[in-house]
Every structure is written in C-alpha cells, then in structure tokens.
A protein has these predicted regions:
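Conserved N-terminal phosphate-binding loop of PLP-dependent enzymes in the Aspartate aminotransferase
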Residues: 1-427
Length: 427
C-alpha cells in the first residue's frame, strides 16, 4: 500500500471540506512516534490535536479498553447505566477546582460538551445570551461556530448562526489588546447589545487553543468572575484543549485564584477515545430536566474505561510535573534561538502548552508564510507540528507528556535546524 494511492482514493471518496494536513497515512504509532504505510517514522508533536497527553497506545489504556471490550461495548447510559460512568464522575468531581458540591455529565466530543454547557447555563439562569471572545474556538456545531471567534476556515458559508451570542476581544499584549480593553468591550456590550440580566454565561478558554495558545491573564479571569458575580452570569471555562496535565495542572483553572461555574473537557480526557464532559456546581448541573442531557454514545463504556486509565497514568507518571519540566526546556530552546531567528516574536504558554509566534522583522506583521515553511520543513524531516492563531502565524507544540527524553531531544534538534534553515542561518 502506497501513500500516493491512498491519497488518490481519499480525494475521490471524501469531500474537500474535511481538510487534511498530511499526505501520508498512518500504519502504527507508539507513545510519541508514528509510522506511515511505507514505513517512514515521524515524531508526533500534534498528538491528534491535543488528544494524546498520555501518548499513543499507552499499555494501561490498551489494557483498560481490552478488559471493557470483553464485558460490554455499549448499552446507552441513559437506558442501562454502568458503574464506571458513575465512578469516573466521582473522580472528576473530586479533582475539578472548587470545594463546592459538583456533578459531571459525559458526552462524546468537545463541541458536544460546549453545546451542553450552554444548555445547562441557559436552563439554570433562564437567560439566552452568551458572551465569547475573539480568537476563541468552541467547536464545529452551529452553536460552536457561533461562539468561535475566527471566521476562516470554520465559519465560511455556514451561517446564519444561533443568535444571542456576542464577542469581545481577548487580551493579547503582543497585538495591543489589554485586559482593560477586553473588560471595557464587555461593558460596552451591556450598553449597546444586550442587557446583562439577559446573559446566561461568559465562556472563555484559559489558554486559547486554535486562537494561538494565548494564556488568559490572571487579572482578566478575576475581572470576568467579578462581572459574573455582579450580574448573576455563569462563568464557563472551556478546557477541551487545556485539560488533563497539558498546562502543568490537571485543569488550567487551577492556575487562577477564582473559580468557574462550569468546565468543559474532552480531548486528552480519554487518551484517544471519544469522550467529553461538563463538570460544575451541582445546583447548576441539576438545572436541566431529566432527559435534557445525554446522547446515544455519550459516556461510552470503552471511552470511560480509557479515562480511568488516563487519570491513573497522570498520577503515577507525574505528568503535571513532567509537563512543566518539558515545557521549560522547550521555552528555553526557543528563546535561545531568537537572536538567530528574528521572526520569533513571542514564546508563551503554561506547562507544556507552548507556542511560538512569528512576526515579520521590522514591520511586526504576522508572518504566516514563514510559519508554513517551518511546519513543512519540519514535516519533511519527520517532525509533526501544528499551526494555529487568527493569522496562522503560530506554531503550537502538543507532544505527548509521556515522550521519552531521547525522542524529545531529537525533536528539538530538528526544530532548531528547521528554524535556522528557514531564516537562512547555517545550522
């Protein structure tokens, strides 16, 4: 089987709207390494878009799924429940930030988690409005797209979107947006667009994912909490990409001294299996009537079994600490290259949720072309990187936190060579 043959078949059989970054096809993977159908090896710094904090095919996860497979694969939790769902909810309730009573519901995708968080918030408050932020990404469903603060490629030609959704700028110091600017914009929304007493929720990412790995400043999160408290609005932290040790904490909200009312989760929750969830204040979570939440595959037993294993791995292998350690090494490497690579304008992110932003020297304009060249040259050398950002000028690093030190060092050496080569500096 050849990559070229599969590519031709893919083009004939699947729509162009499903954009695919690579022109090779996976055959097998192990931890942070992946091999294509022709035997070529790649170091995976994409991890299925932040899904594999515990790596490809971790033995504990493989065993957990296999054991569950030998018992049953599906009952639909709303029809015939199972203990593992309840036990996982108990674990999430115990570990999520906040000492108040909590409840958790499970779904299948990150977009589903966001949709259900909005449903819960509207049910709890009796209000319709939602405020989101520019650069935010919340999924590809209609409500997810309405909340998302980036047009191309996610929202092109798909409207109209659900109403009563409003956007404010997200703080971004590099591009001149301060916390004060963001809060002032929310206050203006209250004057010009929607009465705050009609707003059910404010939803934000503690670190924006697709928007460029922009961390929310602590003063911004405090200000959001203050606004919510003043107006009876619920605060939703979308942790689909930040959760489960990526930022050096189990939840990114643990970096802040205020709490969200609801937290969405998905991606690395189940180590490659489709599982998402919403955890939040028990009284808020109970606002939806029986039958109002759920889904045919929501909380699938195979995915739930995998999630139990993920939590064990994070604890046993100290992945929160490992995330901080690896992230510090990567940030130091990228910072050391700024003298040789003047396009490096910013290196940022907590734990191992690291990104580098490229701007054109002199003009300070976003350099998407340079960013794409870095990504493609890295791919040619066997290193998978993802691009993000409103201007597509940011490379984000999403390596498995279980990556071995030799493979991590090899990847950083490739990255250094590629950056220097792209800018024209001898490696």
């Amino acid at each position: 089987m050849k990559n070229a043959d599969l590519q031709a078949r893919k083009n004939a059989a699947t729509p162009r709207g499903v954009g695919v970054m690579c022109d090779f096809y996976a055959a097998r993977a192990e931890n942070a390494e992946l091999w294509d159908v022709e035997g070529r090896r790649f170091i995976d710094f994409a991890a299925g878009i932040a899904v594999l904090n515990t790596g490809h095919r971790h033995p504990k996860i493989v065993k957990a799924i296999s054991d569950q497979l030998n018992s049953f694969t599906h009952t639909a939790y709303q029809i015939v429940p199972y203990a593992s769902y309840v036990e996982l909810a108990e674990k999430i309730n115990d570990r999520a930030p906040g000492d108040f009573p909590k409840k958790t519901a499970f779904f299948t995708t990150g977009a589903e988690a966001v949709e259900n968080a909005i449903k819960i918030a509207r049910a709890a408050t009796g209000r319709p409005g939602v405020i989101a932020f520019s650069g935010g990404f919340h999924g590809r469903t209609m409500m997810g797209m309405a909340l998302t603060g980036k047009v191309a490629p996610y929202k092109l030609n798909f409207g109209p979107f659900p109403g009563d959704v409003f956007h404010a700028p997200y703080p971004n110091a590099l591009h001149g947006v301060t916390t004060a600017d963001s809060i002032k914009a929310i206050e203006m929304l209250f004057k010009a667009d929607i009465d705050p007493k009609r707003v059910a929720a404010i939803i934000f990412e503690p670190v924006q994912g697709e928007g460029g790995f922009n961390p929310a400043p602590a003063e911004f999160v405090r200000a959001l909490r203050k606004i919510c408290n003043e107006h009876g609005i619920l605060l939703i932290a979308d942790e689909v990409q930040t959760g489960f040790a990526r930022t050096g904490k189990l939840f990114a909200m643990q970096h802040y001294d205020v709490l969200a009312d609801l937290i969405t989760m998905a991606k690395s929750l189940a180590g490659g299996m489709p599982l998402s969830g919403v955890v939040g204040r028990a009284d808020v979570m109970d606002a939806a009537a029986p039958g109002g939440l759920g889904g045919t595959y929501a909380g699938n037993p195979l995915a739930v079994a995998s999630a139990h294993a993920v939590l064990e791995i994070i604890d046993e292998e100290k992945l929160c600490e490992r995330a901080t350690q690896l992230g510090d090494v990567l940030k130091a490497k990228l910072t050391s290259l700024q003298a040789d690579v003047p396009q490096i304008a910013d290196v940022r992110g907590p734990g191992a949720m690291i990104a580098v932003e490229f701007l054109k020297p002199g003009s300070g304009e976003p350099d998407a072309e340079f960013t794409k060249r870095v990504q493609m040259r890295a791919l040619e050398r066997g290193l998978l990187l993802l691009v993000c950002g409103v201007y597509s000028n940011v490379v984000r690093f999403l390596f498995p936190l279980t990556i071995t030190q030799p493979v991590f060092d090899e990847a950083l050496a490739i990255l250094e060579e590629v950056l220097k080569e792209t800018v024209g500096v001898p490696a």
